[in-house]
Amino acid sequence: MKIFYDNEVDALYLGLGEETPEGVSEISSGINLDITSDGKLVGIEILDASRKIDIQTILSYNLVLNQKMLAM
């Protein structure tokens, strides 16, 4: 999983795969799922992210995961 945060537009993206999404499904206001043509979930986009979740907590998880992977 790859985590991207754009603080200029306050958007968080969780990349769940390398496949190119073919469509988007809005599941709630400002929360979108990127899906392939066969329905596989490949990404989650959260707009106005800092109002919906603790961004620093999410970004720190990414750092911890990367450090554990480097230790292997």
Where are these regions (language model features)?
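Short, acidic, Ser/Thr-enriched surface-loop or helix-capping motifs
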Residues: 7, 35-36
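Short linear motifs in exposed loops
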Residues: 15-16, 45
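Short loop/turn motifs at secondary-structure junctions and domain boundaries
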Residues: 23-27
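Short loop/turn microsegments at loop-to-beta-strand junctions
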Residues: 29-31
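C-terminal structural segments of small proteins and small subunits
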Residues: 44-72
